Structures are given as C-alpha cells and as structure tokens.
Amino acid sequence: MKILRGEEIAEKKAENLHGIIERSGLEPSLKLIQIGDNEAASIYARAKIRRGKKIGIAVDLEKYDDISMKDLLKRIDDLAKDPQINGIMIENPLPKGFDYYEIVRNIPYYKDVDALSPYNQGLIALNREFLVPATPRAVIDIMDYYGYHENTVTIVNRSPVVGRPLSMMLLNRNYTVSVCHSKTKDIGSMTRSSKIVVVAVGRPGFLNREMVTPGSVVIDVGINYVNDKVVGDANFEDLSEYVEAITPVPGGVGPITATNILENVVKAAEFQKNNL
C-alpha cells in the first residue's frame, strides 16, 4: 500500500515558481482579504504568506473586523485597477449576508487566483484553462506525480470549488468521470466501480473499505477537526492496509493547494505583464 504524500510535489512546484520569477524579473503580488477572525482562515492566510516569501511573491493580508458588502466591492474595484496587485483572494468563511460568488464576479478574471469567477470556470468547461481552482489542480498534481493517468474516477462532491471544476478538468485530460452527491442513491456502487476515488464531503471517516476495492486509489480532500486533530473524509486506519494507495490528511492534498494559489499568482502576473 502506497501513501500519496503531497509535500514533495509542493516543494518541486515551489522551486519551479521561484525559478520562473528569477528568470522573468516578475515581482508578483497577492492581496488577501479576510473579514472576521476565523482561526482556520488565519492559519491558511499565514501559510500563503510564508510560502509566498520563500518563492518570491509578496503576499499581503488585509483584515477587517467588520465591513459592508458595498464597501468590500468598492475595495475590490480599487484593487482590480491597481497594476501593482496581480491577484486578489477572499478568505473563507465570510460573515452571514455576504454573497461569495457576487464578490468573485467583481474580480477581473486575470486577478481571480481562486479561479471561481464565471469566466474562469467557463474556460475550464471549454477546455481552455487559464487560472484553475487550487484544490482540483492539487488532485491532478497527485495523479500526475504518481502516474495515475486516464483512469476511471468517481468524485464524491459537486461543489463549484472542488467537484464541478475537477470533473471538467479530468475530462479535459481524458479521464472517465462520475460525480456523486448527497442525492446519489448508492454512492458505494459508484466508488467501487472506479480506479480512483476523490472524496470531499466534510464528514470524518465517511469513506470506508465497504465503499472501495483493494485496487482503489483514494484521494482525500476533506479537512475535519476531531478531538483537536485534523482528519480527512476517508477512514485512514480502515483503508490504509486495504487499498492500493491513499493520501494522508494532513500531508496529502493540502500542501499542494497552498502552492497552487501562488502558481496562479505567477500565471496572472505573466499574463498582466504581456497583455495589459
């Protein structure tokens, strides 16, 4: 049984990004906006700041205890017009009453490093990828690195952050894809029928050995907190001696995801330098 670790992939991608920045003379910059004081969001923001500094990307966190939707959109408009800012990212979760997709709709597609704007999502659907969501990209990075190409895949998630873009990105790469969700009647029959299972349901231990086969490859996108420990959506203890391969949580998809946000910043900076 193989453990599919993400740290080495993230390090190699970071080294590549550092080389691109040094050779090109780019000075990429990312503006993070956080509203409130959610600890998980703060940890993720600090991780991007640390990784950015190591790679050569200026990452700045702008925090608000309280701000109206109107004022937030005005601030985004100012950042959209600022040529010194290459990427804009809104940290989740947002306070009640804020419409995340209305917010990202106001971020220019070439600064939308979360890649959740209608334009960037549409480019994915048309197989014209530009900036892509970091977590789906991380899943594909793991498949590429460990040599799982053009297989059958079942995704247990249909969100615009993971399941929907990932399904289209996999189709673009000649995978055969099934998507399950909360209304799927027999998820286990779907997951057992695919070589690769990607799970992202927000339920610790959801995926167990009854839902997979000994030849399954499990990519766990879930992040849950149980007794002050971070665990995934797959029952790692149950599966680790049963399936062919599995990503750990933490240490699997997560390290690559943060680096992929910064990869989008570099792509955005290159585009803006050459086209604006």
From Swiss-Prot:
Short name of any one Pfam family annotated for the protein: THF_DHG_CYH
GO molecular function: methenyltetrahydrofolate cyclohydrolase activity; methylenetetrahydrofolate dehydrogenase (NADP+) activity
Subunit (UniProt): Homodimer.
Pathway per the UniProt entry: One-carbon metabolism; tetrahydrofolate interconversion
Protein name (Swiss-Prot/TrEMBL): Bifunctional protein FolD
Function: Catalyzes the oxidation of 5,10-methylenetetrahydrofolate to 5,10-methenyltetrahydrofolate and then the hydrolysis of 5,10-methenyltetrahydrofolate to 10-formyltetrahydrofolate.
Catalysis: reaction(s): (6R)-5,10-methylene-5,6,7,8-tetrahydrofolate + NADP(+) = (6R)-5,10-methenyltetrahydrofolate + NADPH; (6R)-5,10-methenyltetrahydrofolate + H2O = (6R)-10-formyltetrahydrofolate + H(+)
Keywords, alphabetical: Amino-acid biosynthesis, Histidine biosynthesis, Hydrolase, Methionine biosynthesis, Multifunctional enzyme, NADP, One-carbon metabolism, Oxidoreductase, Purine biosynthesis
The protein's Enzyme Commission number: 1.5.1.5, 3.5.4.9
GO biological process, alphabetically ordered: L-histidine biosynthetic process; methionine biosynthetic process; purine nucleotide biosynthetic process; tetrahydrofolate interconversion
Family of the protein in this entry: Belongs to the tetrahydrofolate dehydrogenase/cyclohydrolase family.
Gene name in the database record: folD
Species the sequence originates in: Thermoplasma acidophilum (strain ATCC 25905 / DSM 1728 / JCM 9062 / NBRC 15155 / AMRC-C165)
